[in-house]
């Protein structure tokens, strides 16, 4: 039965309009990233890593929406990795099972061991947990025959990682939207790379996505927290700072690619007395 709004009552239609507007806005960003980095092809089986947090649930929800209208016929599989060590966050899976069942998305729940290893090392528990979680995801993707592994990293994560690499390793590297692994057998993709965290928060609130409790208290190290503070400070004067950081790395990569290409040309003409073709182009 369709709901009937009373005269002057526009709350339901306003909420629905906001939901659809947000979904359309975020899907445009996802489609842009997918198109520019060729993330999806027909016949793909995509393993979506879900923790129950806002980022991974938004990713799963958007990919499911995209699947209904996309040109490529890809299969989605949700994967939830459960550590054997309690780290301060709840790990309920019943609501996630219901969510996936209602949408026809297969859900794989895999435990992985971390407690014994942490007892034998002084390494950061969050680092070791993340390492083992990713290893378990790779193994699950291989077992399930998945050729793509989707993570919920967003534009803020990409910018923060770039700043971390710049300040602490003196390298200009970012969290790439797509990375081929294991000689191309598996590709890690980040469809939310162009989506900002604040838009994810709005999306979750608008659609009422079921979420877990508080995130792991060890989930953000002090350096990343500092980079987040720096980024927010810069954004007060430069609202498009995250995109500027992303584009700066992109231009740097293109420049390096051109230089490598020119070096190949120079080597081909190494015995010639005249300037090589690459040098002539630089002089014009």
Q: What is the meaning of each model-derived region?
A:
Residues 2-162, 168-171, 198-206, 272-283:
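ATP-dependent adenylation/nucleotidyltransferase module used to activate substrates
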Residues 23, 27, 93, 134, ...:
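A structural signal for well-ordered alpha-helical scaffolds and beta->alpha junctions
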Residues 29, 33, 166, 230-233, ...:
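Residues that form generic nucleotide/phosphate-binding pockets
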Residues 38, 42, 171, 175, ...:
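Residue-level signal for secondary-structure boundary elements
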Residues 76, 148-149, 156-233:
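Catalytic subdomain that performs nucleotidyl-dependent activation
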Residues 83-85, 114-116, 179, 195, ...:
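Residue-level detector of flexible, active-site-proximal loop/helix-junction positions
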Residues 131-144, 178-184, 231, 235-251:
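Short, basic, helix/turn surface patches
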Residues 209-284:
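The feature marks non-catalytic terminal segments
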């Amino acid at each position: 039965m369709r709901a009937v709004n009373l005269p002057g009552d526009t709350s339901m239609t306003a909420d629905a309009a906001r939901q659809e507007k947000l979904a359309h806005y975020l899907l445009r960003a996802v489609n842009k990233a997918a198109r520019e980095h060729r993330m999806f092809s027909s016949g793909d089986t995509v393993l979506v890593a879900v923790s129950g947090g806002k980022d991974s649930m938004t990713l799963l929800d958007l990919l499911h929406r995209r699947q209904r209208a996309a040109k490529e016929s890809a299969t989605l599989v949700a994967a939830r990795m459960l550590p054997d060590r309690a780290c301060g966050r709840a790990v309920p899976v019943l609501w996630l099972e219901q969510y996936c069942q209602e949408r026809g998305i297969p859900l794989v729940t895999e435990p992985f061991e971390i407690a014994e290893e942490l007892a034998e090392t002084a390494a950061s528990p969050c680092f070791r947990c993340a390492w083992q979680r990713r290893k378990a995801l790779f193994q699950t993707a291989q077992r399930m025959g998945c050729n793509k592994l989707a993570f919920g990293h967003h534009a803020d994560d990409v910018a923060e990682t770039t700043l971390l690499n710049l300040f602490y390793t003196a390298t200009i590297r970012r969290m790439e939207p797509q990375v081929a692994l294991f000689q191309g057998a598996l590709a890690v993709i980040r469809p939310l790379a162009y989506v900002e965290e604040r838009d994810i928060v709005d999306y979750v609130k608008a659609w009422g996505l079921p979420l877990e409790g508080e995130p792991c208290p060890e989930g953000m190290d002090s350096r990343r927290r500092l980079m987040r503070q720096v980024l927010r400070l810069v954004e007060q004067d430069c609202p498009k700072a995250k995109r500027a950081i992303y584009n700066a790395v992109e231009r740097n990569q293109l420049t390096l690619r051109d230089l490598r290409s020119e070096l190949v040309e120079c080597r081909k003409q190494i015995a010639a007395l005249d300037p090589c073709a690459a040098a002539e182009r630089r002089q014009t």
